[in-house]
Amino acid sequence: MAEVELSIVMPCLNEERTLKKCIKDAQSFLRRKNISGEIIVVDNGSTDNSSKIAKQCGARVVKEARKGYGRALRTGFEAACGEYIIMGDCDCTYDFAHMTKMWRLMQSCDMVVGDRFKANLEPGAMSLSHRIGVRALSWLARRRFHSKVYDYHCGIRGMRRAAIEKLEFRTTGMEFATEMIALAELKGLKIKQLPVDYRKSVKGRRPKLNTIRDGFRHLDYILVGAMKPFWRDFWRLTGILLTSVLAGLGLLWLVAQIPREDLKENTQKSVDYYLNYDSGEMKPYLTSDYEILGKNLYGTMMDFYADSIWLSIAYSYDGSLRSVIESKYANVKEDSMGENLQKQLNGELEANEEYSRYWHGSLVIVRPLLKWFSVQQIYIIYGVVITGLLLAIILSLCKHREFVAAGAFAVAAIVAGAPLAAICLEYAQVFVVLGMVSLIAMRLVWRDKTKALPYLFFCSGILVNYLDFLTAETLTLAIPLLLALWLMRKQKLEMGGFKFVLKIMLFWALGYVLMWLAKWLIAWLALGGSAWQSVGAQIEKRSVSTEGGFNHFEMLGYAVDMNFSSLFPICFGSWAGLITAIVVCGLLLLAAKFPKKQLDWLWVSTVLIVSCVPLLRMLVLLEHEVRHFFFTYRALMALVLGFLFVIIRVVDWQRVKSCLKCKNRA
């Protein structure tokens, strides 16, 4: 077999309408120039007849199931045998039949990059937004990487194999085009440019390029992607945090422009509901007349006290940014919060107590809803949203044949009373964030984009701090991370994977803490030192306070007892608790007697560490866990889900099944 001189690599995703012409044109070029070459079509997950057509035309097909322009090209480069490589899109926008000039230039440099703007750019071949974006990003890249390349995004290029082997590619998407030139400049490779025609593709072809999404990926690489990992993460996180703080404050100011009068009718209906139900304080939503089931199911507590504060703050907004940061509510200690809210509506009491350490982000949702709905109706809306998100997680798992995980998640959600979280504005926010982050995390794992998980969890920490009332915020870390770990279980978790999980947890914690610090800092700058003193007092109160004369060990005992006894079905009484204990012990005995012989213990240990996050929270916020056990117990959903995942993975169910069959025969 003759030595291959030139490899022509074409990334392909559903290009059955254009692929044949591109291959034939490339073959024509190789014949005319008498070049010993090969044509490689990298099938990037096509669902049409692209692969079949490529084989029929004599091209070599290489499969790359992981989606991404960069992934496809990197796979094609690895498969190529030629001393020289030309890459080009197989959508008929580039002319493979006339590459003589490129071939000639390749003999005297390391890389040849096409320039579509100095040749024939066919009308309609490039949209106006695409044209502006390419020029702007290319201009920015030239200055960032000290380059003379004019068109950073041209899809047809030629290079020596030796030059490619010097470049350490990391990117997988469209930003690969920018990375290739940036790395070449960094390595000091000799780059030449060549004007190339750019034509319209066939009519009706769906473009693969998304101007906003892919433009942002190019911009991200230009600004921070080429940096060392630490600085890359630092600037990305800084950008996300600053954007989030400004957007969050801006949205609150925007909803503060809704006139109070527009909220008065539905706020009054809400107050009537609170006062008629239980004097505007707290009461379990579900009760029982049967002693064996327990008279009060505290896991269903409706915290009207907190919700009345919420509505009072919403009503106190006067359109100014200061009112947003102060987050004042009406409070006279002799009256219930429902009665205080009624007096505020009647004009008998002004909002007089600051809650600036939070400036409640969830009012971005609740305040506009109050314009059209009463609080009872808002509870229903939240119920539909939360139930929909929980079902979406279960159905997504089932769609990917993860039935066991779907069942475990459903059990954990029921045990922690997740479907009932919507009965109180205070609790609902966590489960909305949990649902959204879980769905995105699972999608990233399924699409093999796990590198984005740390940034997702950083955003999760920011968002839950912005929206939540310190209820069960760790669920937005633990549940999505446990689901991601389950989906990644088939890949043996090496130490690098364990460190990656720790990085995810660190990023979530950073997002949460930094958002809170940003809130406090803004409150301090706007309101003065009193805001910061309030923060310090609340931290001490919720963590190390031992009100009632109890020591820390007694408080810990109360926290454990009250939180665990609020879980379903333990909350139904001692008999239910005993049955639950028997089931748990039975599962542990199964794991001890029928363990799998080959087991990824690092994966198991990692799941257990993530599962214990709510217990760590209990130790840190001890007084808070005792005082507010009726909602903090929901954080234990992570412990339940992690326990079920570990049991499912550790137990050798085939051995259990065989043992049961033997006993039945006997």
Feature locations, PLM:
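Transmembrane alpha-helix segments characteristic
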Residues: 408-410, 598-622
